[in-house]
Design a protein with these regions (language model features):
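Conserved N-terminal phosphate-binding loop of PLP-dependent enzymes in the Aspartate aminotransferase
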Residues: 1-209
Length: 209
């Protein structure tokens, strides 16, 4: 359709899905790509925009007429942030972080999938080391809980009491996004704690059906 495709890789980039870029995991080739956060492992703020040659070429052509590349921000190209980002990327390669994610992905998928055994979980999904569980008042119809109950937010609070910090997302969803350096032992411990917390969440869910 002659429309540029931009991939937002701020969360999914740098190995999160088991490939360097999330787009690769879904066999998608974007025209432009945005990234941040894991670019420097979040030690210092930095972001970047990457683009294919067919997008860059007209920008370059116009810049040559102006005598300067017409793009920039007041705080761009900070040398310390750039140095930290460079070292972070070196460590990702040296420690084979992507290989580690691929090794743990089946364990992650299995453990998050087991959570569907709880009668208030309507759906689970994951790729690499990112996943989510979706709450449902009825597992068959996938009917949602009353949004005023904020079941996911309440569940997150209960889970936190068991030592795991997760995030409630719109639509009664809880996201899982563990550190890419997590060990298999730590991963299983995390899900063991979530399962214990979900026993308490079961009582909460029963009250609001």
């Amino acid at each position: 359709y002659d429309i540029l495709l931009v991939a937002d890789e701020v969360i999914c980039g740098f190995g999160r899905t088991g490939n360097m870029w999330g787009a690769q995991s879904f066999d998608v080739q974007p025209d432009m790509l945005t990234c941040a956060k894991a670019l420097s492992s979040a030690y210092l703020p930095i972001s970047a925009v990457m683009m294919a040659e067919h997008v860059y070429a007209p920008l370059r052509a116009q810049a040559e007429q102006l005598g300067i590349f017409g793009h920039g921000y007041t705080y761009s190209a900070h040398p310390v942030c750039a140095a930290v980002a460079l070292r972070a990327q070196q460590l990702i390669q040296e420690r084979d972080i992507i290989g580690h994610v691929r090794h743990l992905a089946p364990v992650f998928a299995d453990r998050i999938g087991r959570l569907q055994a709880f009668d208030f979980i309507g759906h689970t999904r994951s790729i690499g080391l990112i996943g989510a569980v979706e709450f449902a008042a009825d597992k068959i119809t996938k009917c949602k809980f009353d949004p005023t109950v904020k079941i996911a937010s309440q569940a997150v609070a209960i889970i936190q009491n068991h030592g795991v910090i997760l995030r409630a997302l719109p639509g009664d969803i809880i996201g899982f996004c563990p550190p890419l350096i997590i060990t298999e032992l730590e991963l299983n411990d995390m899900f063991d704690r979530v399962e214990k917390a979900f026993v308490e969440v079961s009582e909460l869910a029963a009250q609001h059906r």
